[in-house]
Amino acid sequence: VKTTVYGLFLCLAAFLAVTLAGNPADADELVRFESAPVKLSPFRISKAREQGEILSQPQGTPLLGYLSRPEGDGPFPAVVLLHGCEGMRLSIKELWPQRLVAWGYAVLVVDSFTTRNIQDTCQTTLPDRVFDAYGALNFLSKQNFVDIRRVALMGFSAGGTATLEGTKIEGNEQLMDHKFRAAVAYYPVCAASQGDATVPILILSGDRDNWSPAERCRQRLARLSDDSPPIELNIYKGTYHDFDAPEFKVGRRVLGHIEKYNPDVAEKSIRSVRLFLRKYLSN
């Protein structure tokens, strides 16, 4: 009997060791962190000193996120995900993290809305999203299983727009302690005024998307200097907004724009993302 009990104890111990060693590959953990604070400029600090004032450093906004990681100790390359103007949805909170973890990446999905009591930003803007992305990067820099030198930023729709804003030359990126290595933007709103990029970027758009017109992305690419990191633009024919999201198998119209899943194009885009991340985060 003692032998049997001891054997059961060893089995249980082995089971717990496997279960508790890190996070399982298909699980996510609710984490809390802050958006990157808006740093005080040297000029503002200098003027305050001249007037005998002491300025306190601004604080970031408290945020929630969902952290997933492959099994093992790492350090792993990682991807920060930014949702669109409608907030969290299945494909961003679950499907993309599962996919990326299976490819060997740690993933942090940023929830920009819950702590701000925001439902959506489809008719407004939230410029703080860029600071949310860098707050997530700061959080990942403190995780010993993440290789902070190999982190990509990836956003969808409004999150894709924030991704482009957060990786443009002479933008807020230059004020941040940590930098992204690459960026992926699904159906973002591009602007020629965004200029050169600070990292290689992959943009994926549909030619029937009138919410995030691909033509604007073409215009930006046409104005890149020879010194800019490469921006790859994939435009898919006959494709609308949210083409990678199975939630929209039945297309719907929102604010005059069509959201519709396209499984064939989704698979093509997923393959492009995998190759792009492998190219720029491999070492």
Predicted segment positions?
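Short glycine-enriched nucleophile-adjacent loop
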Residues: 160-174
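Short alpha-helix in the alpha/beta-hydrolase fold that links the catalytic acid
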Residues: 199, 213-223
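Short substrate-entry loop that stabilizes the transition state in hydrolases
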Residues: 74-76, 81-119, 210-214
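C-terminal catalytic histidine-bearing segment of alpha/beta-hydrolase fold enzymes
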Residues: 230-283
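N-terminal cap/lid segment of alpha/beta-hydrolase-fold proteins
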Residues: 26-73
